[in-house]
Amino acid sequence: MAWNTNLRGRLPITCLILQVTMVVLFGVFVRYDIQADAHWWLEKKRKNISSDVENEFYYRYPSFQDVHAMVFVGFGFLMTFLQRYGFSAVGFNFLLAAFGIQWALLMQGWFHYFEEGHIVLSVENIIQADFCVASSCVAFGAVLGKVSPMQLLIMTFFQVTLFTVNEFILLNLIEAKDAGGSMTIHTFGAYFGLTVTWILYRKNLDQSKQRQSSVYHSDLFAMIGTLFLWIYWPSFNSASSFHGDAQHRAALNTYLSLAASVLTTVTVSSIVHKKGKLDMVHIQNATLAGGVGVGTAAEMMLTPYGALIVGFFCGIFSTLGFAYLTPFLESRHRIQDTCGIHNLHGIPGIIGGIVGAVTAAYSSPDVYGEPGIVHSFGFGSYKMDWNKRMQGRSQIFGLLLSLAMALVGGIIVGFILKLPFWGQAADENCFEDSIYWEVHEEVNTVYIPEDLAHKHSTSLVPAMPLVLPTTSASIVPPVPPTPPVSLATSAPSAALVH
């Protein structure tokens, strides 16, 4: 089937409509939170606050910076491993995230921050919006190289909407805990993306197989994304936790789990290769699995060695998934997972949900202290019949809800994206930047060996024929090529002696 990939009319109109809609909705609904409003000084005076340091901004903004870098730099560069799709990986990730955070601020504002007819906007909102968009970036990895920017915008719109509904039910109605988003961000994002790519299955994708691989420099760029994500993941898992011990504990648990997953990833990567070599795909991705797996239980009393155990197993399962499960799913179940998000986010996300359920179910006042367990899980006087076993069940229900929302939502959105007018590329043109980007090809250069008698002459010339400014090319005698010069001796070659 021939596809029309010229987006000159469709993409600008879509972006313009979406942005104008955002402006109108923000104008109607969004207002500054009191701590971001010019009336903050009156609030300080009323509450007898003497310092601006009490403003929530100073507690939350460092975490926001780290999460923001993960979304735009970490996820963006992690997907630059494809040899001809670097522009699209970073650029389309930038596009969907920029739109997604605006829509997420509205959606989450209506569900969580709606006061007196308006959404109150603070630094906490933008952290939550980045979390929401991180789920969209995860799903993007499954369809990378196979969808148009139009499809990505539509997918982001629906995914942000479904994410917010799922998160509200899970956190506010079921009352599950998910500080680092193993269930709401990673499990939901991964299986939503996998379901979409299953619906969008391309039977002739093998025609683009030569571009569905990396080269030396593209793997290095992807490793930049890995390092950004690895360094900032403790902030990601702790950004929304309560100040104090919970946030402190979340950062420590994530730090340890990430470290453990690196060593087990290297171990398994070497084992599965016949010559014991390491696969860069494993190192770029599976080394991050510990951060995903510890997310739900990050702020719980998981213990340091428990965090190491989680990272240990996440690294193993993630690497084995890249080695064996991804090819199996593509060949047998028509799931074309470009980035292997099932192994980095899906499987570790499920592990994280289970770890959170077990940790919650075995929590006790002996470990947390009586005030600590009330503070961590909300076992208070208003929920006298609530106990740790019920919390464990809530965690499992939350995991199942995320899976169900992802699968059902992915099927619906997948069929919407399958419509033929979104400007998607043909099977033979997938994983190619030049379909949607102006790509300036490099001018190759050739090396002409230096004539030792004329050391001042240049050695690099353009790899194109030299045309002299004459009135007729026919009067220019052909110039014989300069024979190579041996550099083994300082004497000129005999061929150059007249």
Swiss-Prot record:
GO terms for cellular component: apical plasma membrane; basolateral plasma membrane; plasma membrane. It catalyses: NH4(+)(in) = NH4(+)(out); methylamine(out) = methylamine(in); CO2(out) = CO2(in). Residues 31-61, 108-124, 175-179, 241-251, 303-304, 362-395 are extracellular. Residues 1-9, 83-86, 146-153, 201-219, 273-279, 326-340, 417-498 are cytoplasmic. The keyword Cell membrane applies. N-glycosylated. One of its GO terms (biological process) is transepithelial ammonium transport. InterPro entries: Ammonium/urea_transptr, NH4_transpt_AmtB-like_dom, RhesusRHD. Coiled coil: none annotated. Keywords: Ammonia transport, Cell membrane, Glycoprotein, Membrane, Transmembrane, Transmembrane helix, Transport. It comes from the Eukaryota. Gene3D superfamilies: Ammonium transporter AmtB like domains (1.10.3430.10). It is found in: Apical cell membrane. Pfam families: Ammonium_transp (PF00909). The chain crosses the membrane at residues 10-30, 62-82, 87-107, 125-145, 154-174, 180-200, 220-240, 252-272, 280-302, 305-325, 341-361, 396-416. It is a multi-pass membrane protein. Expressed in the forestomach and the fundus of the stomach. Expressed at the level of villous in duodenum, jejunum, ileum and colon. Expressed in kidney by connecting segments and collecting tubules (at protein level). Expressed in testis by seminiferous tubules. GO terms for molecular function: ammonium channel activity; ankyrin binding; carbon dioxide transmembrane transporter activity; identical protein binding. Glycans are attached at residue 48. Homotrimer. Belongs to the ammonium transporter (TC 2.A.49) family. Rh subfamily. Ammonium transporter involved in the maintenance of acid-base homeostasis. Transports ammonium and its related derivative methylammonium across the plasma membrane of epithelial cells likely contributing to renal transepithelial ammonia transport and ammonia metabolism. Postulated to primarily mediate an electroneutral bidirectional transport of NH3 ammonia species according to a mechanism that implies interaction of an NH4(+) ion with acidic residues of the pore entry followed by dissociation of NH4(+) into NH3 and H(+). This is Ammonium transporter Rh type C. It comes from Mus musculus (Mouse). The lineage of its organism: Eukaryota, Metazoa, Chordata, Craniata, Vertebrata. The gene is Rhcg.
